[in-house]
């Protein structure tokens, strides 16, 4: 039975969502109530000093059967980064609880003690079970039937240092890369130091999030950080911002795929009998949406989860193709362009923010590491690599195409060159593999809000997902301006997610433990984020309005 106990102990330190931890704690709370009152009281006393316990008491979160929304955040975001493919799963909750019921009372107490070591400070308080509930005596025969000592146990799905670097780089090197030359065209060459500055401060805010995670073992995700800092309201606000950011990324995927396909096939058009005509970008937007729709219906996203990790290779391939076209295929590099353009700087800042906004999954990467103490080094490597790649692509693209550079540099590359075709198809295929993974966290969070189990049937789920995907198509057709949408996302959402809220949460959770230098630096980043966000959002909305009226 020792192996069974170790398995349950491993499960405790593995990827558990908030509701799973509380259900596991509930399975052993009877024994705590009967024989471990002193230990439980001690845990409560130690709990009372943590930010999370204060948050619990302030918000009266005492019903473990109704934990705060979203419960599925960690699981769904792990799929997005490829850290925890859905095919690699642990024993279902019901099986774990049945197995726990077969243990002797002493073994249950041991499991509860180990659970309290890391989960005694969850975001949700644990209810005291009814005194009438008792643990039935153990039947040796049933114990033999339920024993899993002869079965191979899954290893804890923790990431090595190199895997964590790969996951972090995959999150950062995404849609922002393809529009970096356009961003430098808007701001001029002095935009490059600003890009470097953004890389430094966003890396620093990632380290601040790590310190928030270290403050209590119950904090495991970005919404958890928000709840620890500002209660349930903070959890809801941050969750909504993160899901809106993911939704906007799905819209950008459709725009990106349709723009590149229409560049390959510009003469495609369709006229409907009712007098409606569709041009090439509109046709390919609809077509690519139909192609990704079946992937959103899937329940098992294992293959897509593994393929999405190839996003790092795709980003490197795009940079190599761009350089090859300029150096080998005769386009050449020309040292021209403006030095600085203040009027367009807010748009550039928004795009830079869009390129560095990976903070939604940083807590997941930290929690999944075998050695979390090396997380700051992971961030430094990821941000350094992405910054170097961003600068290289921005310089190559701007010197190759000058003021004619478009919102996506793949649209400028001559289509008759083989590297150009490789780059364009890479820009088409990569979003196809990431679309379902990006929209799945939104789907899972919204499905949590469905009131009855009868409404959560497979057919209703497919209909719901189809409607959500269709809505991203409608938005993409309404605002088919890749760079402007990227600037809007970066100015409004990324400034909040990557700059403002990490600092605010850090100041709140570690209040009274920070030096004046740390407080001053956080205030500076907050002010910078607010000013940049307001200016960039206004500029992006103004451009969007002008484009819509043209």
UniProtKB/Swiss-Prot annotation:
Q: Biased-composition ranges for Basic and acidic residues?
A: 1-16
> Where is it predominantly found?
membrane
Q: Which domain of life does the protein's organism represent? A: Eukaryota
* Annotated localization: Membrane
This protein's record includes keyword Oxidoreductase? no
Q: Provide the topology term for how it sits in the membrane.
A: Multi-pass membrane protein
Comp. bias (Polar residues): 84-99
Could you give a single Gene Ontology term from the biological process aspect? amino acid transport
Family of this protein:
Belongs to the amino acid/polyamine transporter 2 family. Amino acid/auxin permease (AAAP) (TC 2.A.18.5) subfamily.
Name this protein carries in UniProt: Amino acid transporter AVT1D
Which organism does this record belong to? Arabidopsis thaliana (Mouse-ear cress)
């Amino acid at each position: 039975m020792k192996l069974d106990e170790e398995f349950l102990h491993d499960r405790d330190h593995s990827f558990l969502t908030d509701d799973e931890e509380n259900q596991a704690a509930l399975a052993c709370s009877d024994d705590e109530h009967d024989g471990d009152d002193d230990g439980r009281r001690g845990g409560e006393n130690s709990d009372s000093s943590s930010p999370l316990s204060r948050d619990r008491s302030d918000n009266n979160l005492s019903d473990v059967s109704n934990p705060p929304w979203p419960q599925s955040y960690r699981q769904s975001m792990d799929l997005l980064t490829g850290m925890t493919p859905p095919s690699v799963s642990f024993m279902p909750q019901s099986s774990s609880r049945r197995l726990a019921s077969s243990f002797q009372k002493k073994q249950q107490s041991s499991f509860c003690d180990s659970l309290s070591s890391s989960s005694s400070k969850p975001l949700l308080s644990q209810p005291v079970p009814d005194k009438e509930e008792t643990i039935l005596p153990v039947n040796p025969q049933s114990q033999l039937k339920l024993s899993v000592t002869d079965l191979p146990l899954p290893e804890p799905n923790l990431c090595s240092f190199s895997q964590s670097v790969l996951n972090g780089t995959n999150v950062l090197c995404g849609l922002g890369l393809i529009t970096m030359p356009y961003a430098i065209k808007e701001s001029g060459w002095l935009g490059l130091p600003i890009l470097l500055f953004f890389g430094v401060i966003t890396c620093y805010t990632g380290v601040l999030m790590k310190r928030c995670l270290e403050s209590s073992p119950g904090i495991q995700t970005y919404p958890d950080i928000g709840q620890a800092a500002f209660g349930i309201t903070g959890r809801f606000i941050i969750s909504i911002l993160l899901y809106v950011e993911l939704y906007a990324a799905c819209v950008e995927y459709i725009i990106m795929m349709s723009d590149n396909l229409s560049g390959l096939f510009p003469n495609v058009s369709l006229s409907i009998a009712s007098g409606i005509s569709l041009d090439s970008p509109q046709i390919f937007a609809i077509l690519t949406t139909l192609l990704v729709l079946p992937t959103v219906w899937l329940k098992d996203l294992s293959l897509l989860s593994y393929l999405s990790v190839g996003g790092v290779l795709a980003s490197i391939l795009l940079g190599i193709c761009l350089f090859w076209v300029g150096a080998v295929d005769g386009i050449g590099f020309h040292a021209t362009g403006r030095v600085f353009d203040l009027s367009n700087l807010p748009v550039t800042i928004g795009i830079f923010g869009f390129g560095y906004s990976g903070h939604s999954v940083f807590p997941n990467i930290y929690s999944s590491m075998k050695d979390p103490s090396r997380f700051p080094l992971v961030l430094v490597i990821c941000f350094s690599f992405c910054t170097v790649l961003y600068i290289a692509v921005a310089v190559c693209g701007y010197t190759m195409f000058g003021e004619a550079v478009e919102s996506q540099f793949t649209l400028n590359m001559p289509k008759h060159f083989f590297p150009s075709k490789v780059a364009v198809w890479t820009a088409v295929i990569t979003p196809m593999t990431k679309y379902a993974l990006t929209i799945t966290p939104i789907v899972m969070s919204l499905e949590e809000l469905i009131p009855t189990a009868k409404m959560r049937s497979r057919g209703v789920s497919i209909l719901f997902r189809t409607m959500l995907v269709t809505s991203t198509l409608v938005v993409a057709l309404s605002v088919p301006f890749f760079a402007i949408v990227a600037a809007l996302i970066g100015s409004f959402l990324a400034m909040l997610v990557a700059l403002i809220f990490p600092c605010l949460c850090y100041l709140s959770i570690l209040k009274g433990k920070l030096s004046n230098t740390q407080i001053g630096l956080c205030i500076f980043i907050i002010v910078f984020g607010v000013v940049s966000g307001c200016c960039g959002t206004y500029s992006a909305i103004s451009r969007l309005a002008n484009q819509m009226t043209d």
